[in-house]
A protein has these predicted regions:
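C-terminal catalytic core of Y-nucleophile DNA break-rejoin enzymes
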Residues: 7, 69-89, 100-122
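Short, basic (Lys/Arg/His-rich) helix/loop patches that form interaction surfaces
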Residues: 25-33, 119-143
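Alpha-helix N-cap/helix-start motif at helix boundaries, enriched for small hydrophobics
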Residues: 36, 48-53
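Conserved tyrosine-mediated DNA breakage-rejoining catalytic core shared by Y-recombinases
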Residues: 17, 52-85
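Charged, surface-exposed interaction regions in soluble eukaryotic proteins
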Residues: 91-94, 134
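Basic, Lys/Arg- and aromatic-enriched nucleic-acid-binding interface segment
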Residues: 2, 12-43
Length: 144
């Protein structure tokens, strides 16, 4: 819930700033969030579709197909080499329980909720001094 008369429209992240954020998060050993930002910016998926992804779908493949939750449409996504390397590096660092595991799992072992991701993004905005206003999950989709 937002404050009355407040602007809640998500803003996009500048591409260079987004890529710097991906690198900074990786360097700071926040591999899951680095992967989330990279996937969100490169593929333009809705957060509900990103949270539903599993490692077996995206690891060591050139493309994959999903059914979008909101629209029910089938979408084929190609993975460029730069992102493919980043996914493999994050997989090695995160060390998930298996290839069938979801890619975005919290410390509790459950898939993140959208609200939790939004809170983490707002903390990231402050920590990394991002120039984007109203930074949220949808900002990643708009950056695409």
């Amino acid at each position: 819930m937002s404050l009355k008369y407040s602007n809640t429209t998500a803003d996009y992240l500048q591409w260079g700033e987004a890529m710097n954020l991906v690198r900074s998060l990786y360097k700071d050993e926040d591999y899951k969030m680095s992967l989330l930002i990279a996937i969100g910016c490169f593929w333009g998926l809705r957060i509900s579709d990103m949270l539903a992804l599993h490692w077996k779908q995206i690891l060591n493949v050139d493309e994959f197909t999903i059914i979008e939750k909101k629209t029910g449409k089938q979408r084929t996504i190609r993975i460029n080499q730069q992102l493919k390397r980043h996914i493999a590096d994050c997989y090695k660092q995160i060390q998930p329980i298996g290839i069938n595991a979801p890619i975005l799992v919290s410390q509790k072992g459950t898939v993140y909720r959208v609200q939790s991701i939004d809170v983490l993004l707002k903390k990231m905005q402050i920590k990394y001094k991002l120039s984007v206003k109203n930074f949220s999950c949808h900002s990643l989709r708009k950056t695409f």
